Amino acid sequence: MPTSLKDTVKLHNGVEMPWFGLGVFKVENGNEATESVKAAIKNGYRSIDTAAIYKNEEGVGIGIKESGVAREELFITSKVWNEDQGYETTLAAFEKSLERLQLDYLDLYLIHWPGKDKYKDTWRALEKLYKDGKIRAIGVSNFQVHHLEELLKDAEIKPMVNQVEFHPRLTQKELRDYCKGQGIQLEAWSPLMQGQLLDNEVLTQIAEKHNKSVAQVILRWDLQHGVVTIPKSIKEHRIIENADIFDFELSQEDMDKIDALNKDERVGPNPDELLF
């Protein structure tokens, strides 16, 4: 169980990935992205998660550069967008992401959505980039069990990470169990369900008991389920608060109560319906 912001989980290829990071979905490019990245790194974060489609890789890259922390101490993730899927187009998209971020390599590169039929060619491109030493770990995002099963039929390298929507209303038990069995690390996007759970009565009671915020309880629940989590915030006080989750532990009863909130409810698209 992680006990500090710098604690890492070992991926199946031996690379260490921080349990906790900053997500920058819907963070504006330029100053907003730069300042939130700098604030996170200043306050001990070492993992930053962006994507081509977020259109803020430049701002993130400047934040990394201006943070004063050595590149090798950071864990930077980006993702290939749907329209760039395919072998050659993915290779080109990766180079563009690197250029925007002003980096020589990525720690993790993900296929953003499975879509219909291009993800195997896209995966071959990720395997090549990984073998060429341009990425330290490769993975997928929003893949359901059947997508992973299909991918693994032909994959030479198994994904190290699957980043999916995960929160108390979407606990993804089947997918969690499958990934655990395959040695694929699950990672949560939108862990706070875009703020929709902050007034939930069950969560409020648990938070009061531990003298924590609802957000802190949810993020702690992620970690106790063995799920890497990357909450988004642009406010420094919130960036600090989100990460203040290493000094308490949820009981099994707390965990069960939170698990029971599941309704298989999404704030993002259903991966089986987002076809391109």
From Swiss-Prot:
UniProt KW NADP keyword: yes
Function: Reduces glyoxal and methylglyoxal (2-oxopropanal). Is not involved in the vitamin B6 biosynthesis.
Annotated Gene3D superfamilies: NADP-dependent oxidoreductase domain
Family listed: Belongs to the aldo/keto reductase family.
Highest taxon of source: Bacteria
Binding site for NADP(+): 190-242
Residues annotated as catalytic: 54 (proton donor)
Catalytic reaction equation(s): (S)-lactaldehyde + NADP(+) = methylglyoxal + NADPH + H(+)
CDD domains: AKR_AKR5G1-3
MF GO annotations: aldo-keto reductase (NADPH) activity; methylglyoxal reductase (NADPH) activity
PANTHER family the record matches: 2,5-DIKETO-D-GLUCONIC ACID REDUCTASE, NADP-DEPENDENT OXIDOREDUCTASE DOMAIN-CONTAINING PROTEIN
Keywords, in A-Z order: NADP, Oxidoreductase
Binding site for substrate: 112
Protein name as catalogued: Glyoxal reductase
EC numbers on record: 1.1.1.-, 1.1.1.283
PROSITE patterns named among the record's database cross-references: ALDOKETO_REDUCTASE_1, ALDOKETO_REDUCTASE_2, ALDOKETO_REDUCTASE_3
